[in-house]
Amino acid sequence: MSSFGKNSSYRDTGASLKELGDYLDSKQEGKPTHQKTIGFDTNTSPVSIPTIISPPLGSNNSNYGKSPKSSYDNKQTSPLLSASNNRKNNNNNNNNNNATSPKDSSIIGKNNVNSDLSKVSSSLNELKFEKQPIGSTSSTPTSTPSSTPSSSTPSSTPSTPNTNSQQQQQQQQQQKKQQQQQPKQPQQPKQQSKQQATQQDKKDKEQQQQQQDKQDKESNEIKGSKEVAKDGQHGVKQFDDPKQRGKITKKKIIKVGESSRSVQLFNHLPQYNSEFSMGVSVSTDEPNEKYPIHPDIISLGLKYAEFKIAGSNARAIAMMTAFIQIFKDYVAAPDKVYSRELDSLLKRNIQFLVDCRPISISMGNSINYVKHKLSLTNNMSHEGARDYLIKSINEFIERIQMADNAIVKHGCSKINDGDVILTYASSHVVELIIQQAIQDKKKFRLIIVDSRPKHEGRELLHRLVLHGVKITYIMLHAVSYIMKEVTKVFVGAYSVLSNGNLISRSGTSLVASMAKFYNVPFIVCCETYKFTERVQLDSICFNQIGNPQDLVQNLGEKEGSKSLLENWESYSTLKLLNLMYDLTPIELIDMVITEFGMLPPTSIPVVLREYRKEVISIN
């Protein structure tokens, strides 16, 4: 006998139907059903409801969804389901009977079924309205399920979709009303829209003014970069830019034609022109007659162009002595400010030197020194300012000479008896070191490495041969054969960059790489006024182009014989490039000898930071 025996009451049946209602509720919500144990009276044993889960699509498993805990066979039905089916049949037979007795458990079960089903439908409606989108202002539906018994159970469920459709229509109507009311609200503050428009116009005007200010600043920076680019400190002229080229040509004093045989990769560099030997045509416009070119500057510029004055120290000292002569000869009007008038005069004379040959970094630092001292003479008299500037320039020249003396002392201490010293090209400081070592009667051998087209090492050879030193003269391509015998390498410097890289005569990097390969110390001798804050990683961004005609000459040919490239300009596809400098990376440099001592190349930024006022004298 099943658990639904004689002792089962209507409470047992009501509890089981309530669980069935919960099951239907979870079924409609899409929640999986699990096996539940329903508790009855103490006299009856608990009954387990098997889980009923529909099999997935396409599956033929007949046992899918059956409870593994069910003790009944597949053909047997659950006693709870059989009891409920019997009660449903009794309800259908007694639909017309309105009498209800408390003893009749079937009628009470029917009422419980109707009430449970109404609760299920109301809960489903609440779940549907809870899934409404955010922002809907419709009120929650208040469905009052009828507690009166109906004739059949399906008659209670069809009422829900009608109520849902009515509530949805009400929601749509309310949303339409809200949408109609929304555009009417912003029409009230019309003045605010006008104020916003005026504010936007003001903002646009301010942005346009800011853009114009930026453009003006950039144009001023471009103008100032030409002057700053002269000293080699910050900006570099890009001659391949047509705008900058047009501005530079307007500012030029010497009118020289542009070179048509330039190499495309180096169009951004100033091209060499060999028209200075035929004379110089200086423009004499009316606004420029007030600031004439000094004769000493003209002669100095021509010497620069013909390379009669070469070397960073020689060029800087010659320029500073020419400035002293300008200060002595210039007389400003008494009602004019001396510093302003002299500044305009210096700019024009410096531009002439730039047109003759691009000035070196050491010359640029010297010009900055003079301009700094000139700015301190605003409150001085004309004579007092003149004397102060001449005295400052003489001190600067003495500083260069004292720096050379200090470098010579430090360099001689690194030369020992029996050393084999190698030097490349010609450096004034290295020459002084060798002469001092000879005076100290140190026994060493010197190797001079030279290269085309300048052959600067040959001039050094002629000057040192008279001192009785054993000298070996080789060309650059033979460095790898002679480097095995070398103990130290001494070279000069065109400039030392803030990242420790060296700019020197073209071919220096090859010598440094060979010295690194054979573990030979590579020592650089450089004054601190040649240091620059520029950072450069190659020799293409900044360089100078020499006379391409120098590459045509061949020393191996006999006198009177024609050169093989005598008419090279007639070949339109042939272009000659004569770069004057190259860059040696910091990894190949072992030591930099300065007037402050012997430093590693990594300490160059420290010198620029700590001794900037002493080296360059710029606030």
From Swiss-Prot:
SUPFAM superfamilies: NagB/RpiA/CoA transferase-like. It comes from the Eukaryota. GO terms for molecular function: guanyl-nucleotide exchange factor activity; translation initiation factor activity. Residues 57-84, 99-125 have a biased composition (Polar residues). Residues 21-251 are annotated as: Disordered. Its main location: cytoplasm. GO terms for biological process: cytoplasmic translational initiation; translational initiation. It is found in: Cytoplasm, Cytosol. GO terms for cellular component: cytosol; eukaryotic translation initiation factor 2B complex. Gene3D superfamilies: Translation initiation factor eif-2b, domain 2. The keyword Cytoplasm applies. Keywords: Cytoplasm, Initiation factor, Protein biosynthesis. Component of the translation initiation factor 2B (eIF2B) complex which is a heterodecamer of two sets of five different subunits: alpha, beta, gamma, delta and epsilon. Subunits alpha, beta and delta comprise a regulatory subcomplex and subunits epsilon and gamma comprise a catalytic subcomplex. Within the complex, the hexameric regulatory complex resides at the center, with the two heterodimeric catalytic subcomplexes bound on opposite sides. Acts as a component of the translation initiation factor 2B (eIF2B) complex, which catalyzes the exchange of GDP for GTP on eukaryotic initiation factor 2 (eIF2) gamma subunit. Its guanine nucleotide exchange factor activity is repressed when bound to eIF2 complex phosphorylated on the alpha subunit, thereby limiting the amount of methionyl-initiator methionine tRNA available to the ribosome and consequently global translation is repressed. This is Translation initiation factor eIF2B subunit delta. It comes from Dictyostelium discoideum. The lineage of its organism: Eukaryota, Amoebozoa, Evosea, Eumycetozoa, Dictyostelia. The gene is eif2b4.
